[in-house]
From Swiss-Prot:
Keywords: ATP-binding, Kinase, Nucleotide biosynthesis, Nucleotide-binding, Transferase. GO terms for molecular function: ATP binding; dTMP kinase activity. Its EC number is 2.7.4.9. NCBIfam families: DTMP_kinase. ATP binds at residues 15-22. It comes from the Bacteria. It catalyses: dTMP + ATP = dTDP + ADP. Belongs to the thymidylate kinase family. This is Thymidylate kinase. InterPro entries: P-loop_NTPase, Thymidylate_kin-like_dom, Thymidylate_kin_CS, Thymidylate_kinase. It is an enzyme of class 2 (transferase). The keyword Cell membrane does not apply. Phosphorylation of dTMP to form dTDP in both de novo and salvage pathways of dTTP synthesis. The lineage of its organism: Bacteria, Pseudomonadati, Pseudomonadota, Betaproteobacteria, Neisseriales.
Amino acid sequence: MSSEVRRGRFITLEGIDGAGKSTHLSFIRDWLARHGVDAAFTREPGGTPLSEKIRDLLLDPGTVASLDAEALLAFAARQQHIAEVIEPALAAGRWLVSDRFTDSTYAFQGGGRGVPFERIRALEDWVQRGLQPDLTLLFDLPTEVAAGRMAGTRVPDRFEQEAADFHRRVRAAYLRRAEEAPQRIAVLDASRGIADIQADIVLHLERLLERG
């Protein structure tokens, strides 16, 4: 008798640039490994050869794209990512942790660019067919603090070089998403010390682990 493989868990990390996702992603990787969780790690846009090419286009400061073209590119990359990486991992029982997912599109293209949420939702329904993360960790930080952290660290990409108002709209859109899906999105105050933030991360990971 063959036993059915239990579907893996899907975790996403979100936040404005400079919120510290990369630091916490490394912590999550180590924590899951210590607890015997078979997990794969990926990112958006990206995660597949085709999606990485789209990522390069989206982040290149020289790219000129209409609002709708930008949103469509994000979802084109996402569809390939889901088909090639996300769904196979989850179906095989692996946990999948992604640095950004659809909440980023609502935040950057919806909040930042002004693409209507309803238009993004229609693309989400078409591309994802009901797929949603089991847990989203939203690292929230005032935009001024985030800008200070980012200053001088590297050459800014197409989104990072946007004006302060753009990033304030992105943050507001993220918080709106959290209000709309409180059962999935955990808002973490990223202005605190790393140890305090990671203590909260552990609480959410433990709850997810207990759910099996």
